[in-house]
């Protein structure tokens, strides 16, 4: 599956009155009806609600979960990958940085298991060229600059990751989709 066009992130933080599956599904539906080529959704519950309302939508799914022993929070482990896929995501977004994962799980093992047991297509949320290339080598078919500016090693930098994009595009295999994500705040960008 190749993305084309704008994929709209339809998410609401914990505690927000907008964090309701019906509200998220309505916002996703409105985005798709107004030209979005897909939506990026957080949590199995929201993914399921959008899949039910918009059965043909391209859904990039993730699950943000915090663990005390790790700074990885975007679909950090097998339990989250499995739940996001089961909820109806077409592509599962995972943190593909080299940071320590909860419970000692490792990126290579998670990617291999997701492909073997689920046949899931994976989007690597990365913060650097090295992490993007590594994720593609491990089997991720989408790479996004999602975590640029949000990890310990990139915390001083501000998204969007304009400098990262050409380097990734030059070095990633042509069949790997590259997504600019984060910090885009205007139509001109």
Regions found by a protein language model. Name each.
Residues 1-18:
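N-terminal amphipathic alpha-helix/helix-capping segment at the start of soluble metabolic enzymes
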Residues 7, 38-40, 91-94, 123, ...:
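Conserved beta-strand positions in the central sheet of alpha/beta enzyme cores
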Residues 21-25, 73-79, 105-111, 129, ...:
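Charged helix-capping and loop-helix junction motifs
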Residues 24, 69-87, 127-141, 174, ...:
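Catalytic cores of alpha/beta
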Residues 35, 54-59, 86-91, 116-119, ...:
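Glycine-enriched alpha-helix->loop->beta-strand junction motifs that scaffold or abut catalytic
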Residues 50-52, 56-105:
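Glycine/small-residue-rich loop that forms an oxyanion/phosphate-binding "nest" at active or ligand-binding sites
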Residues 90-102, 136-166:
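Glycine/Thr-rich beta-alpha phosphate-binding loop at enzyme active sites
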Residues 101-117, 158-189:
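Active-site/ligand-binding-proximal alpha/beta "capping" segment
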